[in-house]
Amino acid sequence: GIIATIVISLMKSFGVKIESRLVWDTAHRLFGFYSLLALFLALMLLSLLLGRKETLLGYRDILKESGQGNPDYLKKYGDFPTIFNMGVNGLAMTLILYFLGGDFNGPTIGSIFCLVGFSATGKHLRNILPVIFGVILAGTLKVWSVQDPSSTLTLILVTTLAPIAGEFGIFWGIIAGFLHSSVALNVGILYNGTNLYNNGFAGGVVAIFLVPIILAIKDRQKPMAIYDEEAKKLAIKDKLFDKQEVKLPKNIFWK
C-alpha cells in the first residue's frame, strides 16, 4: 500500500492518468453459492469422519486461540481440526454473504478462499464474527450498502483484523470492523485502486490507530483493579484481626 501510494503519487505528478474499471459478475450467484456450500460441507464431514473425537477436541482448542502471532494450527492441533476449522469459517462466510444478498463471482470467491486459507493460521469463528458484524452494522448506518462490490469484499476481508477481537474481546472487534469499513472504502484513493491488497493495507492502518488506544484504556483500568484487589486484602485482614483470628506462630520470641 505504501509503495503503491508513492508510485501513483509520482505518476500523477507527471500528468499520468490512471483509469479504473469494474468487472463484476452477477449472473452466477446461485452456482457459486451451492458450489462453495458443497465444498465446505465436504471439508467438515470428511474431517469429522476421519478425525472423529480428535477433530472436535482440537477444534475446541482452536477456538481458545486469540489469533495473534500467526499460530500454526496444523502443527499445534493436527490436520483434521484445522481442516474442520477451515470448513466452518468458509461455510459461515458463504452463508453470511448469501443471506445479505451479496454476489458470488471471482473476487468474492477468491476472498472467501483467502479467509479459508488463513483459517489454518489464526482465524476461527470466535474472532472473525465480531469484525464481520462491525462491517454489517456500518452498512446499516453509513451511506453505502453491503451489497456494493467494494463493500462486499470489505465484508469478507475485514477478517484481517480478527486478532483484535481474539485478544481484546467482542466489543473491540466490532469497533475494528466498523472503522475498517470506512478506511477500506476510502484509502484506495491514495493509489487509484492499483493495490490488490487494499483491505490488508486498510487493516494495517486501523490496527495502528486502534490498538494503542485499546492498550491505553486497559492500562488506565489496571491500577484501579490493583487498588480494588489490595483493598479487599486489607479488609479481610482487618476482619480477621477484629475476630482475633490472627495467631502468632509458636516460639517466635522464645524457645
Label for each model-derived stretch:
Residues G1-G90, T94-F99, S145, F168, ...:
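Signature of multi-pass transmembrane helix bundles
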Residues S151-L157, F171-F178, S182:
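Alpha-helical transmembrane segments of multi-pass membrane proteins
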Residues I2, L91, L115-S119, I136, ...:
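Transmembrane helix-bundle signature of multi-pass membrane transporters/permeases
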Residues L141-W144, T154-I170:
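Short helix-perturbing small/polar motifs within transmembrane alpha-helices
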Residues I83, I128, T152:
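A short glycine-/small-residue-rich loop at the edge of a beta-strand within enzyme catalytic domains
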Residues I96-Q147, I156:
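Conserved mixed alpha/beta catalytic, RNA-binding, or beta-rich assembly cores of soluble enzyme
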Residues R126, S150, T194-N195:
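Alpha-helix N-cap/helix-initiation motif
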